[in-house]
Amino acid sequence: MASAEGGGDKYRSFLHGDGEKKTVWRHGAPPNYDLVNKLFEEERTKEWAEGSVEEKVQRLLKTWEMEMVHKVRPEDQKSVNLKNYSASTNGLKPLTREEVMAMGGYNAFLATTLPPEHRIYDPEAESVESATSTFLTAFPRGFAIEVLDVYSSPSAPRIAFKFRHWGYMEGPFKGHPPHGGRVEFFGVCVFHVDEDTKVEKAEFFYERGNFLASFLTAPAASASASGCPVMRGAD
């Protein structure tokens, strides 16, 4: 998540430069990750050395996420294989690139088989635009992501890693008032990559229910940490 304009970015590739002059951006300009990068740097639990396996995988993850959310045309997405790409969440049916682009990255990531009446957030009832607005409103500073561990080489056919995703609910979410507390979840991802380390298939596994439930009330740890209703941090 990011605002509409910005300078260079030290954690993501394919965001600025000559190669992006013809890129079509969803909001008309490259996103600005300054606020979320600040949160990331302040609250990350791992600081990987530049050029390390973990740093390379983290850069690929952040770049992939940026391109899926902010680049409109498939041909502008340089972190994924142009001909072969699919993504799945929690073992559900893999989605093609066209399906992901049509429904949006947020909705694809939050796919569920729960009956509609039990959904805190219903990705099937949201458009790309409404989903983006919903999460930008809830997390005005964004929702940071870091790689915690890598279980294989980034040059392998499969890259398996553990990640942490977090932010602070400082805005309303689907009618629920902001509680100012930290909202976070942990998960595991497997990137299937080609010989150029472009993602051909992305498989994410995480606890969706607990993540969304944390929008409804301040997490116990965050609530006890401060009496202030607005607490710091988000990406």
Curated annotation (Swiss-Prot):
GO biological process: defense response
Organism of this sequence: Hordeum vulgare
Protein's UniProt name: Pathogen-related protein
Keywords: Pathogenesis-related protein, Plant defense
PANTHER family named in the record: OS01G0248500 PROTEIN, PATHOGENESIS-RELATED FAMILY PROTEIN
Inducing factors: By fungus Bipolaris sorokiniana infection.
Top-level taxon of the source organism: Eukaryota
Cysteine disulfide partners in this protein: none
